[in-house]
Amino acid sequence: ISSRNAKDFYNLMDVYLDAVFNPRLLTDKRVFLQEGTRREIFNKDDEIQYQGVVYNEMKGAMSSSEEFIYQAMQEEMYPGNYPAFNSGGDPYEIIKLTYDELLDYYKRHYHPSNSFTVLYGDGDVDEELEHLDEFLSAYEYKEIPNKIGMTLAKDSKNFIERAYPNDVSDKHNYAYSFITGDIDNTRDSIMTEFLSKYLSYFSNSPLKKKIQEMGIASDLLSYSNYGYGNGNFTDINMILKDADSGKADIFKDAVEEELENIKAGRINGDIYDSALNLMDFTLKEFANTATKGIALALKAVAMWLFDKSPATAFVYNATLEELKKDQSTFINFVKDVHKDPKLIDFYPVKDFYKDRDEAERKALDEYKANLSDEELEALIKENEDLKAMQEAGDSKEALASIPTLKLSDLPRDIEKLPLEKISDSAYYSKEDSKICYLNLFFDISHIAEEDYVKVANLVDLLADIKTEKSSREKLETDIFKTTGAINFAASVVKNYKNGKLTPFVQCSAKFTKDKAVSAMKLIDEIIKYSDPSDEKVLKMNVLESVSDFDNNVLNIAPAIAMDVAKAQSLEKERLTLKLHGIEKFIHLKELKANFDELKDEEIKDYKRLMKTMFRKDGFISHYSFECRIAELDKAIAELEASLESIDAP
C-alpha cells in the first residue's frame, strides 16, 4: 500500500492488516466460491461449469505460450523445488482445492509471526511502528516451520523435448539455460545480468547478431532472474523464438561458441562498454517510479524470504567497479559458471489442452450424474446465494466501517510542480537525481491521419536503424556508451484547458550531466539523418513486433476490446489506436504476410515521413535534473533553431 497522505496511509494500513489476518474467507465460504473456484449451475438441465476469479485468470495466463514456456523452464531447471510449481495455480489443479484445505493452509501460515513488513518513505517511523504494534500486539508469537530449501537434481537430462500450446504456428522455441550462482551473492547476480545484456540486449550483441545473420528465428531473448531470484540461485536463460524444427543443435552451438569466445578473452569492447553503462543506469535508477517504495520492498523481500539479508539486494558498486577495471572478472565468472546447461526444444501442439478439457468435462458430467435431486438443488441454491451476494453489494453497516478522510484531512493547496520556464518551448524541473531525464515533443498534427500507423512503425525503428553518418551498429554503440537509452514513441496529448488534441512524436533520453551535449548530438543525428531503407532490419522489426503481439494478445485482449469500444465515441482513443494500438499491429501483420509486395511502398513512406515529422512548429522540450545544465539548454535551443517550419518544402 502507499499514500502521500499520512491519515490515509494509516487507514489503508488498518484495512490491509484486517483483510490479511481477519479475512471474511474464514467465516463465509462464498468468498472461496467467488475468488477461487466453484461448480456453477443455475438450472438443473444445464451443464456444470467451473468458474472463479483466480481459476479464470490462470486459464488466461496459461494459454500464453510465453507464460507456459517460462513455467516449463522452471520445472526443468529446478525439478521438485518450489520454482517448478506454478505459484499462480495451474487451473487444472485449482479445481481440486477444497474450502477446508484452504482454511487449514491459511491457519497454519497466515500469522504475523510468519510475515515480513517493510516501511518506506518520509513518514514518522516511530509513529508507524507504534501503529503497527497496536494491531500486532494482539497476537502471540509462534514458531512456524516455513523454511524453503532447495536441492538441485543430480544426473538430470541436459536435452529435453516438451510440447507447448500454439494454435497459430508450427514454429519451435528453444531454451538454453544454466545456473550461475547464489542469489545472496550480489556479485553473481550482477554478473549474470551483465552476461545476459552482453550476449543479446543490443542488435550488435555477439549472440543476437549471430542469430540474426543465421536467419533461423524471429528473435532471441535473454534474461536472468537478477533481483528476484529463484530462492537460492541465479540463472540465465536464452530463448530462440519461432524457429523451425531441427535447430536445437545449431542454437546450442551458437550459444556455446559465444560463451567460449568470452572464456578465451575474445570480447567485443564496444558492446562490453555499452552493457556496462546500461547496467550502471539500470542499477542507479532502479524503481525510479511513483511507487518506488513498493518496488524496493519487493526486491528486499525476495532475499528476506529465504533467510538472506534484504540489504544484499542493493549492494552493487563494488561489482561494477570490478567490471570497469578490466574484463578478467567477467571472463573468469563465465569460466566458473558455465556448467551443466539445459537445452529444451519446445515443439508446438494445436489444441494442447484438448484432452485435459475433455477429461474435465467428462468428470463434471459424471459428478452431476451421481448427484441426487436434493444434492443438485443444493448446488443450484449455493450458486444462487453467491449471485445474490454479488448483486446485493455491501451493506450500509459494512460501508460505514471503512475508514474515510475528512475534508480537513486534505491539503488545501494543490502541489505545484517545480517547473521553470526557460523559453516559450523549453522547460526544466528540479529533481533530486544524478541522472538527467530529457523529453522532446514534436507536434505531428500536420501529418495526414492515414499515415499514423506508419508513423507508429517508423518511430519504433528510430535509434535502431542506420543514419547517413553511422552504421546501425555504430549508432547503437554510441547511444549506450553515452546514454542510458534514447527512445521514440507516438502519442496523443489532450490540453485540458481548451480540450484540443495534439498528436506528438516524443523522444526520451537519459544521461549523466557530462554526457548531455553528446546525447543531444546523437538525437540530432537520429531525427535528421536516419535512413529507413534497410529491408532486412525492417523485416526483423516486423517479425519481432508481430511475434511479441501474438504471444501476449490473450493477456491483453480485454484491454484491446476496451480501447476499441472507447474509440467509437472518444476522439483521443480513436487516434491512439492508430499510433500505438491495435490498428498499428493490424498493419504490421499485413506487412509481415505480404512483405515482399509491400516493403518498397512502406520504405518510401518512411522516407517521406522522416522529412516532415520533426518540425519546429509546436516543439516542446523538458528535462529534469538536480540543477540547470547550461550546455544542455544551449544544445536544445540550437536543435530547435535548426528545425524547419511546417510550411517548408
Regions found by a protein language model. Give the residues of each.
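M16 family metallopeptidases and their MPP-like homologs
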Residues: 1-22, 28-41, 66-92, 114-120, ...
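Short helix/loop capping segments that flank catalytic or ligand/cofactor-binding pockets
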Residues: 9-12, 62-63, 105, 127-129, ...
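Generic recognition of flexible, low-complexity loop/linker segments
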Residues: 103-107, 162-164, 222-226, 321-322, ...
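An aromatic/glycine/proline-enriched structural segment found at the starts
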Residues: 116-172, 286, 615, 620-649
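Segments forming glycine/polar-rich beta-alpha architectures that bind adenosine-containing cofactors
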Residues: 312-463, 472, 618, 622-636, ...
